[in-house]
């Protein structure tokens, strides 16, 4: 699990992210597609052009789930059933998405991002969401 200082680092940055979850979620998906074009095939029904409503909506859903997880940093296991079936994410793809998310956070918030804490948090959320 995350240490108290890691939880604090994640929660404090989230306060700045929360008002712009759709925008930052969409940017994270755009970054994922740019870094790993092969992932576009999972979104064949989406308009994946930058800033599209599909990306804003889906990015917002992903970040909404992260926000819910952050509210329960002490009990992340309760998210196990939430997205696994709906997202059908492999752990490899979750790692790629997590890296894209951290890149976007760093681009927006620079030194305020505790990358180690966010890597650990996204890794734990990813492990929960991709376990069967």
From Swiss-Prot:
PANTHER family from the entry?
Answer: HEMOGLOBIN FAMILY MEMBER, HEMOGLOBIN SUBUNIT MU
A GO molecular function term, named singly, is: haptoglobin binding
Manganese is among the record's keywords: no
Protein name according to UniProt: Hemoglobin heart muscle subunit alpha-type
Pfam families found in the cross-reference section: Globin (PF00042)
| Organism of derivation | Aquarana catesbeiana
More details = This chain appears to have diverged from the line leading to alpha-type hemoglobin chains close to the divergence of alpha and beta chains.
GO biological process terms held by the UniProt record: hydrogen peroxide catabolic process
